[in-house]
Structure formats: structure tokens, C-alpha cells
């Protein structure tokens, strides 16, 4: 396919037009008085959101050169979202400011490579200063403040703070859509996995259709159990002790299943069988987790163990097990705390090594089941459109809170970026490097300027006053007052602010050093029709 090539000023200007179109659509959402953006969906109702990265991902421009500029800024938002989970609008605003200022200077004759060095030098200093003024997050109230600022809703803040208090920093908090109007929190304590009983005849409570086992023995194996003879020996030992039993196996079927159900109905013993969770290697790892949590062993040929020779000593135990049609929950497993800690550290090490987002998520779930618990925030709303918008805001709030726990908090509302202005301005440089530093200085003011603008105020006036205020004092755009931002609970996670600045400067510096842009020429004849495929002239239909 033929290509279009643009050089130097033409190339950069075309990309800037794309940057501006995307950034202008995103930045109207910034701050407490930011507006929403409506996104068309080909199927279903439109999506109304103020989430920067969601908006950025939806934007495709017709002009290929402009589209490349838009995609670069979309990358800033996506990368910030991947690292910190929030701050995507701030990152977009910073990137636009740096690119606009940078292109002015490059057009005026500045050397882009020198400008880039200046940007990198200024951002490195800015990040050091952000870390220096960062405060650790210690109380439930602080967590609630971070979540409330991100979601724009105090109730959501309290809900997320309670969830984190209940499941700990290692716990998993998931967000689901509720069928009702209210948003509520559901916490599962203990280890839960998504496998239920293999037969409904195993229930102990026919009203709730669940099996509750008090102080059961737990047999854990990766084998299929077809014949009752395979587990007869260990079953007899458990019956002698007069305690119930949970069997976790690849499957329990045929004669083994029938015998277990028959004896359960006769009242000979209380036993429940469930399938092992997960698949393949992940299944083995999860069975090992259950074994560590309950103080048992996985009966597997990999370790040279057989079901026929299994003893009570190899079984795990727990205070209580609840099994429903869909889930099994093990409460207060009797495993050794030292072994559980070692297993937790092993999973943490695997999380640091993996490059797959999916694997990391699954490892995080396993970690939560061992170390904390699982909390589910069920999001309710009157309409589907409101539900989607609310769910996105709560996801942002949760990510913000996690980032705050990790690296601490700084004054919110863009105040922290202006408060480090003087430290960055004190950097000594000359020529184009100094120009690069000045570009970053101008961009540090931009989030405050945009928040004020979205609140219907003159941003430059607010910025000038902010530079002369005491450290930590900022402008609360929600009510127009000047307050101590941290005392007022207007805070941003340090990680979010840092990531936004780093990613914005990275893309801005690359765009400024661009000298040629290559794009596909549009096909004037439109897309070619597909082959006929013997369908009588319907080849072009898709």
C-alpha cells in the first residue's frame, strides 16, 4: 500500500491537532466540577463517563496523522491507568501542555534533543520532590478520603475504606453489578473457590440448599475418584473419629458418588464432595494452597502418595466449611501460620516476576485467599447507563486507594504539582536544556488551571495565588475556598501523580523529537469487496 510522508513542522503540527482533539475531550472531566462525556455504542445505550482512559480509548480520528497524535496521548492515559489505576485525565492534561509548549519552542528554533534532556531533568527532580512531600496513609479515614475524592462520592469512600479494613491490603476487592438500586459491600472471610457440591443430596440445610460441616477433615487430591475402595480406608478412620469430611478431588463419580450419597442419606456419616478449582498447573497450585491453609497434604502421584494408603494425618482440617451449589468456603483452616506466611511470600515473588496481567490477577486472588479475604462491592443504580458510569467511578476509586496505600498521598487538586514548582525552577541549566525545564514548569500549573476552568473560574489567577500560599494550602474548586488540602481530605495518591507526570513527559519528549511521520494513504476506491465464495453476488456482505 502507498504511504503518505510528512516532515518536520508539517508532521508535528498534524500530530498536535490530534493531541488537542483527544485532550480537549478528556480534560473537561477534570476536578470536582468536571463534566461527563457521552460515548456512542453501536449496540445498547450510550456510555456516560468522566473516566479519562475510557474516553481516550474510544477516540479514532479520520486523518491518519492526527490519529497518530491522538493515539500517543491515549497511550499516556493507558499506561498511567495500568501502573496507578487512576490519574488518566491529569496525565492527558500534562502531556498536552508539554507538547504544546514544546512545539512552540521547537518551531522557534530550539533543538529538540536539548529540550528533551531538559524535560527529563526537570521531571526527575519533580518526582524526587513529590516523594519527599508524600505522607504515608495510616487511618481508615484517610483511605475513605482518597476513594471519595476519586469517585466524587463520600459513601463510596466509606464503602471502600471498610472493604480494605475487612480484607487487608492483600485482600481482593472485586466490583460487580447489583440487581438492586443500592450499592453494598459483601465480604467473604476465609478461602472461597467457585466449585459447589457434586450432588444436591449432600446438603445439610435443605432450605438454604447448602452443606455446613463443623470441624471437618479435608481430603485433597488431584485424582478422579470412581471407586469407593480407593478412599474406603481413610473414610473408616474419619467415621471412627465421628467428624464430617470434605473431599476435594478432580471429580467424584460413578459408584464412589452413589455410595457417599447413600451413606449420607442413611446418616452413617456426613460427607460432601466438590471438584478441585482451576485447571492444569493452576489447579495444582490452588490445591497446594488449600493444603497449606488447612494443614493437610495433596494426595498426588507427583509426591508418591496414593489414596488407598492415605491416613487421617494427611488430611487437612478447618473450623467450618460451607458448600453451596456454586461455591465452597473454608473458614479458619488449621494450617501452620509459618507455612502460610512462606506460601504468601512465594506467591508475592511470583507476582513480581510475571509479565502477564492475567497471571498477576490470578496470583493476587490466590494471595488474597491465603492472606486476607475477598470483598465484593455490588454496584446498584436505577438505569443501566448510570450503573456503567458508577461502576467505572468505583473502579477508579479502588485503584486510587490501592495506589495511596502503596506510596502515600500528597495534596490534591493539582496543588502538589504547583508546590514543587520552586524546587524544579531552581535547577541550573542553559540553552535548550533550560527551555525543556521551563516546559515542565508550565505544565505543572496546568492541572490546577484546568480544574479552575472547569469550575467556571480564571485558572491563571488561581495559579498565581497558589504559588504564594503556604505549603499544603490549595484551592477547593468544589466550594471556592482556600484550605489546607490534606486537612480538608482533598488528597491524591503520590503514585498516581508521579505516574501521570512520568508518562506524560515520556510521550511529549518523543513527539518533540519526531522529524518524519509515515501513514497509509487512504484508499479512494473504498474497501475492496471480498471474494464471491459461491454466494451469488453477496461477496461484499460482512
Swiss-Prot record:
<dbReference type="InterPro" id="IPR018370">
    <property type="entry name" value="Chaperonin_Cpn60_CS"/>
</dbReference>
<feature type="binding site">
    <location>
        <begin position="476"/>
        <end position="478"/>
    </location>
    <ligand>
        <name>ATP</name>
    </ligand>
</feature>
<comment type="function">
    <text>Together with its co-chaperonin GroES, plays an essential role in assisting protein folding. The GroEL-GroES system forms a nano-cage that allows encapsulation of the non-native substrate proteins and provides a physical environment optimized to promote and accelerate protein folding.</text>
</comment>
<comment type="subunit">
    <text>Forms a cylinder of 14 subunits composed of two heptameric rings stacked back-to-back. Interacts with the co-chaperonin GroES.</text>
</comment>
<keyword id="KW-0547">Nucleotide-binding</keyword>
<dbReference type="Pfam" id="PF00118">
    <property type="entry name" value="Cpn60_TCP1"/>
</dbReference>
<feature type="compositionally biased region" description="Gly residues">
    <location>
        <begin position="533"/>
        <end position="542"/>
    </location>
</feature>
<dbReference type="GO" id="GO:0140662">
    <property type="term" value="F:ATP-dependent protein folding chaperone"/>
</dbReference>
<keyword id="KW-0067">ATP-binding</keyword>
<dbReference type="GO" id="GO:0042026">
    <property type="term" value="P:protein refolding"/>
</dbReference>
<feature type="binding site">
    <location>
        <position position="492"/>
    </location>
    <ligand>
        <name>ATP</name>
    </ligand>
</feature>
<dbReference type="InterPro" id="IPR027410">
    <property type="entry name" value="TCP-1-like_intermed_sf"/>
</dbReference>
<keyword id="KW-0413">Isomerase</keyword>
<dbReference type="InterPro" id="IPR027409">
    <property type="entry name" value="GroEL-like_apical_dom_sf"/>
</dbReference>
<dbReference type="GO" id="GO:0016853">
    <property type="term" value="F:isomerase activity"/>
</dbReference>
<keyword id="KW-0143">Chaperone</keyword>
<feature type="binding site">
    <location>
        <position position="413"/>
    </location>
    <ligand>
        <name>ATP</name>
    </ligand>
</feature>
<dbReference type="InterPro" id="IPR001844">
    <property type="entry name" value="Cpn60/GroEL"/>
</dbReference>
<feature type="binding site">
    <location>
        <begin position="86"/>
        <end position="90"/>
    </location>
    <ligand>
        <name>ATP</name>
    </ligand>
</feature>
<feature type="binding site">
    <location>
        <begin position="29"/>
        <end position="32"/>
    </location>
    <ligand>
        <name>ATP</name>
    </ligand>
</feature>
<protein>
    <recommendedName>
        <fullName>Chaperonin GroEL</fullName>
        <ecNumber>5.6.1.7</ecNumber>
    </recommendedName>
</protein>
<keyword id="KW-0963">Cytoplasm</keyword>
<feature type="region of interest" description="Disordered">
    <location>
        <begin position="521"/>
        <end position="542"/>
    </location>
</feature>
<comment type="similarity">
    <text>Belongs to the chaperonin (HSP60) family.</text>
</comment>
<dbReference type="GO" id="GO:0005524">
    <property type="term" value="F:ATP binding"/>
</dbReference>
<dbReference type="InterPro" id="IPR027413">
    <property type="entry name" value="GROEL-like_equatorial_sf"/>
</dbReference>
<dbReference type="InterPro" id="IPR002423">
    <property type="entry name" value="Cpn60/GroEL/TCP-1"/>
</dbReference>
<dbReference type="GO" id="GO:0005737">
    <property type="term" value="C:cytoplasm"/>
</dbReference>
<dbReference type="GO" id="GO:0051082">
    <property type="term" value="F:unfolded protein binding"/>
</dbReference>
